[in-house]
């Protein structure tokens, strides 16, 4: 019988691969960065405004992730890079730094960086300035990152572009107009890019989480609304970041190669 530790340890299916995870200093991005590292990837933890939190993620990866022989000698396992994904020059530098430090092309891009309206304004009440900022980070940023990845990811197998979306694109809840619009554009762009990358063996997919217990989710919501959201889920709870990270890990692995140009919904059954 195999030892218990061998059962609980994830296979190092991403050993030798380099992954950039934008917006990975906190929330879903943080969980994804740690999970990809657990699968053997060397990871770029990207942040824009949270350096302390980003360094904590890097420390968690360095301290807790496998020292297996498959990844031994490939040091460092993780680096922290500041970049505003809405700025093309900073995204280019993000990829440059990954290639320089890891001495390898990037294999995996996960675009998790995003912002939302903390006041949950209606479309009629939202300022143009806030709308522009949300589109700049969520849509323009996803475009800039995906464009850079399309030109620089390893071809011929193992290349993955994974963009985070939201179940709001399907539910069309009021008071989330700008955020929903920004992510609907990302889903359309991902499908088109998948077609444009035909023949490269680079896959492009979206992961569309339902409500997940993050700071961004809870901001501006009353306890009454949170309880209502829980009741709408078949599990009777809010999703957690650990529910989303393995979905991304699967898409990033060789096992997920046949999934391409898709929007994968991960919401515990709150949307059927």
UniProtKB/Swiss-Prot annotation:
The record describes the protein's role as:
Aldehyde reductase that catalyzes the reduction of the aldehyde carbonyl groups on saturated and alpha,beta-unsaturated aldehydes with more than 5 carbons. No activity on alpha,beta-unsaturated ketones. Can use propionaldehyde, butyraldehyde, methylglyoxal, (e)-2-pentenal, (E)-2-hexenal, (Z)-3-hexenal and (E)-2-nonenal as substrates, but not propenal (acrolein), crotonaldehyde, 2-butanone, 3-buten-2-one or 1-penten-3-one.
Cell location: Plastid, Chloroplast
Give the enzyme's EC designation.
Answer: 1.1.1.-
What keywords are annotated for this sequence in UniProt?
Answer: Chloroplast, NADP, Oxidoreductase, Plastid, Transit peptide
Q: Which GO-annotated molecular functions does the record name?
A: alcohol dehydrogenase (NADP+) activity
The cellular component terms of Gene Ontology attached to this UniProt record, alphabetical and capped at eight, are:
chloroplast
Q: Which enzyme class? A: oxidoreductase
The name this protein goes by in its record: NADPH-dependent aldehyde reductase 2, chloroplastic
For NADP(+), which residues are the binding ones?
26-50
Family classification = Belongs to the short-chain dehydrogenases/reductases (SDR) family.
Query: Which region of this protein is its transit peptide?
Result: 1-53
What organism is this sequence from? Arabidopsis thaliana (Mouse-ear cress)
The catalytic site is made up of: 179 (proton acceptor)
User: Which InterPro entries does the record cross-reference, listed alphabetically?
Assistant: NAD(P)-bd_dom_sf, SDR_fam
Q: Name one Pfam family in it.
A: adh_short_C2
Tell me the PANTHER family matching this sequence: NADPH-DEPENDENT ALDEHYDE REDUCTASE 2, CHLOROPLASTIC (PTHR48107:SF20), NADPH-DEPENDENT ALDEHYDE REDUCTASE-LIKE PROTEIN, CHLOROPLASTIC-RELATED (PTHR48107)
Question: Matching SUPFAM superfamilies, A to Z?
Answer: NAD(P)-binding Rossmann-fold domains
Q: Which residues bind substrate?
A: 165
């Amino acid at each position: 019988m195999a030892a218990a530790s061998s059962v609980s340890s994830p296979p190092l299916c991403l050993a030798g691969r380099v992954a950039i995870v934008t917006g990975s200093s906190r929330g879903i991005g943080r969980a994804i960065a740690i999970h990809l590292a657990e699968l053997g990837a060397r990871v770029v933890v990207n942040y824009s405004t949270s350096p302390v939190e980003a360094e904590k993620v890097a420390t968690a990866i360095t301290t807790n992730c496998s020292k297996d022989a498959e990844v031994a000698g490939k040091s460092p396992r993780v680096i922290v890079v500041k970049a505003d994904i809405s700025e093309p020059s900073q995204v280019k530098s993000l990829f440059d730094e990954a290639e320089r430090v890891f001495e390898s092309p990037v294999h995996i891009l996960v675009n998790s960086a995003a912002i939302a309206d903390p006041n949950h304004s209606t479309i009629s009440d939202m300022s143009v300035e806030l709308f522009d900022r949300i589109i700049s980070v969520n849509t323009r940023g996803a475009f800039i990152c995906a464009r850079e990845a399309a030109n620089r990811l390893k071809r011929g197998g193992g290349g993955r572009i994974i963009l985070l979306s939201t179940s709001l694109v399907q539910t069309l809840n009021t008071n989330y107009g700008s955020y929903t619009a920004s992510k609907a554009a990302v889903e359309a762009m991902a499908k088109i890019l998948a077609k444009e990358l035909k023949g490269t063996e680079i896959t492009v997919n979206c992961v569309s989480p339902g409500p997940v217990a993050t700071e961004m989710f809870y901001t501006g919501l009353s306890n009454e609304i949170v309880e209502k959201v829980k009741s709408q889920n078949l599990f009777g709870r809010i999703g957690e970041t650990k529910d989303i990270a393995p979905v991304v890990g699967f898409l990033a692995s060789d096992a997920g190669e046949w999934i391409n140009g898709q929007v994968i919904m991960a919401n515990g059954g709150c949307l059927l």
